Structure formats: C-alpha cells, structure tokens
Amino acid sequence: MSDVQSNVKPLTLTTGRVIFAIAGVYVTQSLVSALSMQSLPALVRAAGGSLALAGATTLFMLPWALKFIWAPWIERWRLPPGSQERRSRMLILRGQVALAAMLTIAAAIGWFGREGGFPDTQIVALFVLFMVAGTVASTIDIASDGFCVDQLTRTGYGWGNSVQVGGSYLGMMCGGGVFLMLSAASGWPVAMLMMAVLIMALSLPLWRITEPTRTATIPHVPALGYALRRKQARLGLLLVLMLNSGMRFVLPLLAPLLLDHGLSMSALGALFSGGNIAAGIAGTLAGGLLMKYTSPGRALLTAYGVQGIALLAVVMTLMMAPGHLLLQILQCLVIVQSISLACALVCLYATLMSLSSPLQAGVDFTLFQCTDAAIAILAGVIGGVVAQHFGYAACFLFAGAFTLLAAWVAYIRLHSARELMTSAID
C-alpha cells in the first residue's frame, strides 16, 4: 500500500494558476477599502452629512491595523493542527460572498433611503456595515496571503506581490473613481450593486481551482509568540521599520505639496486617479522583474535607492528649480515616487514572504503588514507636524536620507543573513 502511495504525485498549482486565482481577491480587498475611505465620505457629504462624519471614515483603517490580534485564530482554522487539510480557498470564498452580500445590503439601504433624504440613521447603518466589511476584507487578506506563501515558490513571490500591489491599484480605481462615475450616471445604490456583482465575478478564478493539501500532518498551533521568537520574523519587522519609515513620513504631504505650489484640485484628481495608477502598475511590474533576476538584497537596494534619490530630488527642486518649471518638475517627481513606491513594496513584501514560516504564513505576514500600517499612521502624523514647523524641504530631506541609509543597511543585513532566507523554519 505504501508503494502505491509513494507513486501518487501530490496536487500542486503552477505559479500562473495561483496568481490568476488570487488576483481578483486582492482587487476586492482594495475595492472595499476605496468604497469605505474614498467614496463613502463623498456620499455622506452629498447626502448632507457633516464633515466630522465624513472624516470619521478613517476609522475603517482600524481592522487593517489590528488584524494581527485575530490572525492566529484564523490561521488555526486555515491550517488545522494535526491535519493535512488546507482551508484557505473555503475561507476566502465565503468571505467574498459575505462582502458581496454586504454591498447588496448597502445598496438596499440607499434605495430605501431615497425618499426620506437619507436620514442619519441610515448613514450610521452604512458606517456600521462598512466597518464589518472592512473586518471581513482584512480577515480574507490573512488567508489569501497565507495561500500565496503556501502555493508559490520562492521564485514566484515577486510575481505574487506584483499581483497583490497591482491589484490594490485596480481595486482603488474601481472602488473610487469608477464607482463615483457609475453613481453619477445611475445612482449610488445601483453602482453599489454593480460592485457586488463585480466581487462575485472576481471570485470565479479561485472557485475553479482545488487547493492542495499539506504533504504531512503537522501538530503546530499558530501563535504570535512563535512568530516573535523566530529570527526571520524579527528580521522582517526590522526591514519594515527601516525601509518604509522614510516614505511614510512624507506620503500624506504629496497632495498638499502640489496644491501649495499652484496645482488645481481637478488637475490633482486627474494626476492621482490616472497618472498614479498607471505609474503604480508599472512599478509593480518593475518590482516583479527585480525579484526574478536579482537577489532580495539587491532588489531592495535598487528599489529603495531610487525612492530615496527621488525624495532628495524634491528637495533640490524646491531649492533650485525656476519658478515657471517648479510645478511641472514636482508633478514628474510624484509620478516617479509612485513607480518607486510600488516597486519597493513588491520587493519588500516578496522578501517578507520568504521570511514567513510555512507553519503559520498568515500570522507572520499579517504581523509585517500591521507593523507597516502602524508606521504609516505614526510617521504620517509626525511628518505633518514637522512640515508645519520646518517646511516641505526639511521633511523630504530627512525622508530621502533615511531611506538611502535604510536601503544600504538592509542590503548589508540580508547579505550577512542569507541562511535565514533559505531556512523558513528554525
């Protein structure tokens, strides 16, 4: 009997099938975030809601920053201890259906609220609904990241993260600009219903595949403590802290920088909705190529090196560019920043996948993401205060110099820790 079993080839998925299956899921997650944090404020204000209520949409970030708390429980359900079973596909698809159902409910709330002028109770109902949707989407993300780490080889991590970052740009476009255009043409309840249908369509590729089981029964119980005890996880947290702090410090300042130097609001919208998305997709492809043809250390050094140089170029432009060319150069540099940001994120998160334990990939990768989210919140607040007191040039000078130093330190650290990159379990 054992001879027969040894000749049975275990089910595996090719890189192409994994990427095709999971791409729509990553689009969905960003779509829901864009609906919550971009489109919902516009709907609230258009319906007569207060600016304070519109500003409260930043609370939808909370599930994404706090999902590390419930990640171990999700991972234990996804990878049952003592079993060869994997439940990523089942968990993700159920979550996708739940998201589509919640958007359908949101459409119904909007439809029945038309006659009454959209009272506050229905606005509050939408807020509660989208908070739940954000929690579901962030939970799906735990399972989908674990699925990618499980099914992709190390050489495929770059392409997997290209799809992840590229999918986020497409999702933001669908949940933001496309949704608002559909709302203007057909009313937002109809647009919301169309988004629900889109989510179901994006789920079909994953529904059509069969998730391979694990090759052996593993008794490991996923836990945050295990992650923090691993050298690989601590290295990953260090990389996130070093490499992303600089750009997160100035990222919220890009739009105010352009507005303060004369760019109109409509032109800013066109730049951020069209140019930034195209640049971001180009950056994801560049990141995938870097990870395919270079080592993680060299890829990070290149991507974050370009990012640091672009940040310092903003300082040089503010100090030396002629007045009639200043705005045009700044717009070009913002596009370069978008390319370098997407490229850097692909390289960083592909490296973090390599540092995630296959015993609990969802927990480890979620810990990295939540650290990045916390850095984004903290660095963004500090950057705004520094810009208020010392000006844009000081902020971009610090961010550029810090990013270049971090890129070099990360390269040295990864070069001296190559054994950690080839040993996910210790």
Where on the chain are the PLM-derived regions?
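C-terminal ends and interior cores of transmembrane alpha-helices
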Residues: 93-119, 306-323
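Symmetry-related core transmembrane helices of the 12-TM Major Facilitator Superfamily/SLC fold
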Residues: 94-100, 190-207, 394-412
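Helix-to-loop junctions at the C-terminal end of transmembrane segments
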Residues: 67-84, 282-297, 387
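Helix-loop boundary and gating motifs at the non-cytosolic
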Residues: 6-64, 234-239, 244-261, 269
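C-terminal transmembrane helical hairpin of 12-TM major facilitator-type secondary transporters
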Residues: 298-348
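Glycine-rich segments within core transmembrane alpha-helices of 12-TM secondary carriers
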Residues: 67, 158-177, 369-379
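Intracellular juxtamembrane helix-capping segments at the cytosolic ends
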Residues: 139-152, 342-357
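Juxtamembrane intracellular "pre-TM" segments in multi-pass secondary transporters
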Residues: 2-15, 211-238
